[in-house]
Amino acid sequence: MSLDKIMNEAISPWMKGDGPDSDIVLSSRIRLARNFKKYQFSTMQNEEEAKLIQELFKKEFINKTVEPFGEFELLKMNELTPLQRRVLVEKHLISPNLAGTEYGACLLSESEHISVMLNEEDHIRIQCLFSGLQLSEALQSANQIDNWIEKEVEYAFDESLGYITSCPTNVGTGLRASVMIHLPGLVLTKRISRIIQVIQKLGLVVRGIYGEGSEALGNIFQVSNQMTLGKSEEDIIADLKSVIQQIIQQEKMARELIVQNSSIELEDKVYRSYGILANSRLIQSAEAANCLSDLRLGIDLGYIKGISRNILTELMVLTQPGILQQYAGGPLGPEERDYRRATLIRERLRIEKN
């Protein structure tokens, strides 16, 4: 695995999967927060400690293979260009917070299922990504990597509290489980606000596609647990999965309602968006996201034939500003990005139809 390969292959292998409930659930993510016992939290640590953590991971973990994820490579943030950091964020491999750090790093698996962020809010954040609704499978893989790292690292752990983390809401299991879910039916029927209120009352958090502070582009929402103390990992996963399954049922009911009551209007909306995507010469990120959401809904409902449903996930990543500029070989102005975005979408749709 090389940096060039990571940068130039925008679609991570996990994105090409077709997991359970993938007509509505795009991906499942598990993140485990861990800290070294002997160092101050990242928010308080000095440059020397941050570098020592990097060096330990460089010595013990790079070029090592863990099946089925392949070999691991260490990417140091201060050795990457701002554009390269942005690409990693847009591929969901690192957080925007890590991208802005001087001594942050990322231990990345060849399959890109696993990303271990270093010197972010916590010393170590293990992230595991799977397609569809596969929270239990993602947790099992994250625990496998956690055990691998713990052989070389003494974690900050308290017998009564659990894992000690920088943010109090992560104390305990240190587990953050989240699901990326496509909810156009609930948005179109104007039920999404009520659903979000119910989700929040259950102690879960709803965010946009790139996490905290981001908007829900393309009717894609991220639902995650909030508290990690006082519950086992299995209970956290079970509770989140139960809520997600109820949201899936609500989304399916909303789609059925639209088809029953507004079928021709929905079909028109789908084909108008398809026409924009297939023919535009300039298209901005937000418009592309909304049109791709409509196209994906049309594919799921059988209006559009011969196009993979994975096209939403793929093109939502491929058409992000950083990845467009990476493919172009350097910075692009807004209009140049819109032109390249439109061209890429047209070409991708043409390949699908052929």
Curated annotation (Swiss-Prot):
GO biological process: phosphocreatine biosynthetic process
Record protein name field: Protein-arginine kinase
Reactions the enzyme catalyzes: L-arginyl-[protein] + ATP = N(omega)-phospho-L-arginyl-[protein] + ADP + H(+)
Function comment: Catalyzes the specific phosphorylation of arginine residues in a large number of proteins. Is part of the bacterial stress response system. Protein arginine phosphorylation has a physiologically important role and is involved in the regulation of many critical cellular processes, such as protein homeostasis, motility, competence, and stringent and stress responses, by regulating gene expression and protein activity.
Domain Phosphagen kinase C-terminal: from-to ranges: 24-254
Gene, per the UniProt record: mcsB
EC code: 2.7.14.1
GO cellular component: extracellular space
Pfam families: ATP-gua_Ptrans
Binding site for ATP: 27-31, 92, 125, 176-180, 207-212
